[in-house]
Amino acid sequence: LVAVKSFWGHLRKGRIVILSDGTLTTEDRAVLAWHCGNPEIIDIADVDHNGFPAGGAWERFLSILDRRADDYVIQLDSDTVTLGRPDVVADAIAANRSFTLLGGPEWDIGVRTCTDYVPPSPDNPGEARHIQSRMERALAQIEGAGHHGYIRGCAGFAGFARGGNGRETARFFHDEMARLLGHQAMAEWGSEQVTSSFVVANDPDPVLLPYSQYGNYWAEPWDADCRFMHFVGAHR
């Protein structure tokens, strides 16, 4: 509720759609109806995977892609707080441009082609094995890599412009990564985030949110002009 009401209260537009994991009680739904304006609630069991992985936030992502033909859709994680008016986001919506929160300040470099993108060097073997690292190392090998873009974004806060091609771009990327890394790899937690970043990067003229105003919290002070914070991992 903090995530939704802080964002909705500052943006002052839009309607709420909630993906339920199946545990919402009647009382939960009544609270959400009161605070969120009778939101549409999607049962996770009703999402059609159609060859995409189950779990790992894929149902959320697929639900967004299925709705963007007619609406501008924003993914908002529950571990976020909007601290001020999100003007860059409001402008992106008005211009019908997709946007994404960045993975860190070092990624404020613009979209790179999949052949030009240089993934960060892992700090330890665990990072090297992480699905995001493996997928990013494989980017240059996808079909037509030089004609596709990528940015290391964060799926916790991303906007998808109205009128997109639904699941088409995500399907292409998923299938290419499954070919290169295996279908089991694409079921690992984190594969959806890389796919989300790929989809945003290949939408027309995407907006990369300035990290000083829209960031991830790592127990460090944020700028006075910070508008949005994503509290990741142990910092939730």
Regions found by a protein language model. Name each.
Residues 1-2:
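N-proximal low-complexity "stem/linker" segments adjacent to membrane-targeting elements
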Residues 15-23, 102-103:
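Short internal beta-strands
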Residues 24-70:
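Active-site-proximal specificity loops/subdomain of glycosyltransferases
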Residues 73:
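Short aromatic/hydrophobic "clamp" motif used to bind/position activated sugar donors
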Residues 77-81:
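The conserved acidic donor/metal-binding loop of glycosyltransferases
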Residues 82-121:
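Conserved donor-nucleotide/metal-binding helix-loop-beta segment in metal-dependent transferases, i.e.
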Residues 130-236:
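A glycosyltransferase accessory/donor-loop signature
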